[in-house]
Amino acid sequence: VYMSGSRVNCNVPNDALADYDIVYVVKDTKPFYEDSHYMERFGEILYMQEPDRLDASVGKKLDFNEKYTWLVIYTDGNRIDLTVCNEKKADITGDRVYRVLLDKDGRFANAPVSDDRARWVKKPSEAEYAAVCNEFWWCINNVVKGIKRYEITYAQDMMNYYVRPMLLKMLSWKVGILTDFSVSVGKSGKYMNKWLLDDDYEMLLETYSGGLAGEMYHALKVMADLFDKIGLFVGDKLGYEYNERDSKAARIYMDMVRKMKL
């Protein structure tokens, strides 16, 4: 039995909302997935999800005899993500952040030392840096067209699923530079405020807009300003050239489309 995730990672905040990610390595998973009442021993269940069963119900091919997972929230507020799996699927080295709770058969005697290095921000190559810059500025055209046409759901998707990830990537590289690439910023950059300047973080928060066209234009402009600022910083520190031509061109197009009569 081992636990992984934030509960065993000393480098991330830990509070009452942190999940318990528990894995039981067993010889036979069938008794567990056929009758899960044993989970009630951990407390009264408020509600739960069985992602493997849901995936199988829509045609995804899964072998419950290899691995099965439950996501459970109890009435006391605790959440347990519990997996039973055979030894073949016990991926203790893949996560690298874990704590062995019980090892009756000595299966984890030679397990590597637990750490979160695999999640640290990685220094980008010059090609990766250039690609992120180009993707950010290019994808802005889809956002501004969506706003202009009042296709708000489309524009929001373009902003949040294509443009924003590039901004967060660039911000994570700044954090990497400030920390000698020795930390993780967490999923969706949720820990970045620990290292970013207050002004930078406040600008980032300003990029999360509502559904009004004016709000979205403003958020997009702030995104562009912040990306320029951080992109120049990262490029300077790593010795990479920042593509100011794309930045200027994208801004020209943004203004052109906003003033356009359809």
Model-found features: residue ranges?
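Short, solvent-exposed loop/turn segments at secondary-structure junctions
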Residues: 8-9, 29, 87-89, 177
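Metal-dependent nucleotidyltransferase catalytic core
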Residues: 4-17, 23-82
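Glycine-rich loops and low-complexity Gly/Arg-rich segments
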Residues: 25-29, 46-51, 96-98, 105-109, ...
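A contiguous, low-structure linker/loop signature
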Residues: 77-107
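Short aromatic-enriched loop/helix-cap "lid" or pocket-rim segments at secondary-structure transitions
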Residues: 13-16, 94-95, 185
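Conserved nucleotidyltransferase catalytic core and NTase-mimicking acidic/glycine-rich helix/loop elements
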Residues: 120-262
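A short, charged helix-loop
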Residues: 98-127
